[in-house]
Structures are given as C-alpha cells and as structure tokens.
C-alpha cells in the first residue's frame, strides 16, 4: 500500500515540477 502512496506523491511532484 506504501508503493501506491509514493507513486501518487511522485506523480504530483513530476507533474507539479513540469508545470512550474
């Protein structure tokens, strides 16, 4: 279940970083 949480967190970071 931790993998999913990390995956979602990473997704936001990747998207947010690219959006910035």
From Swiss-Prot:
GO cellular component: extracellular region
Subcellular location: Secreted
Disulfide bonds: none
Domain LCN-type CS-alpha/beta: 2-20
Cross-referenced InterPro entries: LCN-type_CS_alpha_beta_dom, Scorpion_toxinL/defensin
Domain remarks: Has the structural arrangement of an alpha-helix connected to antiparallel beta-sheets by disulfide bonds (CS-alpha/beta).
Descriptive protein name: Neurotoxin BmK 18(2)
Species this chain originates from: Olivierus martensii
């Amino acid at each position: 279940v931790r993998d999913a949480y990390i995956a979602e967190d990473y997704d936001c970071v990747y998207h947010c970083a690219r959006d910035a």
